[in-house]
Amino acid sequence: LNLIRRLFSMITVINLTLLIIYKIFKIQILKDVISSMSMIIFLMVFPFWLTGDIFQAYDEMLDSFNIELQNTYLKYVLCFIVDFCIHVIPFILMGFPQNNTSIIIALFIIDIWYFIIYQNVSDIYTPFVNSKLHYSVIFVHICMLFLFIVNSLLFV
């Protein structure tokens, strides 16, 4: 039961759900909000990859699910493949958002997730990821502000 609650509170499961919903909606603004959310989720994971913290996150994740692999190389390759499928492929399939309004709406939705769901269900991720996630949220806000400014300047 705890595992199911953790999984459904994770933003990664939300990202995979968005990929399914994306194909259903015909209204472009909804599709654009969904693609914006997928991009934001990708950007939330990016600092972990950039700093190399992802390896410690992988170790703690496997430990939390009681999965033991003796081969370190195999362990990291399998984790990276799963991580790539969950965070990168949805972003690639949905593409970049087309307007600033959808970016703002998506950022607002992600903020609601962060401040309401994540803050109330504190054991969603491993302790290491929990200690670093607020930096990812700040990073996403900076990236979205930059993207918003660039979009505004390019499409005046």
List the predicted regions and their residue ranges.
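Early transmembrane hairpin module of multi-pass membrane proteins
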Residues: 1-28, 34
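Interfacial loop-to-helix transition and helix-capping segments at the boundaries
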Residues: 2-7, 75-83, 130
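Alpha-helical transmembrane segments in multipass membrane proteins, preferentially the mid-helix core
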Residues: 87-105, 115-120, 149, 153
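Interfacial segments of alpha-helical transmembrane regions
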Residues: 25-39, 96-107
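Aromatic-anchored segments of alpha-helical transmembrane domains
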Residues: 39-48, 107-120
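Membrane-interface transmembrane-helix boundary segments in multi-pass integral membrane proteins
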Residues: 3-6, 119-156
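Transmembrane alpha-helix/helix-exit interface in multi-pass inner-membrane proteins
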Residues: 27, 32-61
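Membrane-proximal helix-loop-helix units in multi-pass membrane proteins
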Residues: 47-102
